[in-house]
From Swiss-Prot:
GO cellular component: large ribosomal subunit
Name this protein carries in UniProt: Large ribosomal subunit protein bL32
Family as reported in the entry's similarity comment: Belongs to the bacterial ribosomal protein bL32 family.
InterPro entries: Ribosomal_bL32, Ribosomal_zn-bd
Source taxon at top rank: Bacteria
Recorded name of the encoding gene: rpmF
Length: 57
């Protein structure tokens, strides 16, 4: 495991941490039972097979 050689300043630490941002999940269109829906790509196959309840909020 990497170990820092010197102490990192608070300003440098906070500016580095500020680069990490959450991203919205990319939605793709899928037609289920004749109705167009938008689901995350990782749930696309499950939505097509009917394993995911898309009517639930």
């Amino acid at each position: 495991m990497a170990v820092p050689k010197r102490r990192m300043s608070r300003a440098n630490t906070r500016s580095r941490r500020a680069q990490w941002k959450a991203e919205a999940t990319g939605l793709v269109s899928v037609t289920v039972a004749g109705q167009p829906r938008k689901v995350p790509r990782r749930l696309l196959k499950a939505a097509r097979l009917g394993l995911v309840d898309l009517d639930r909020r």
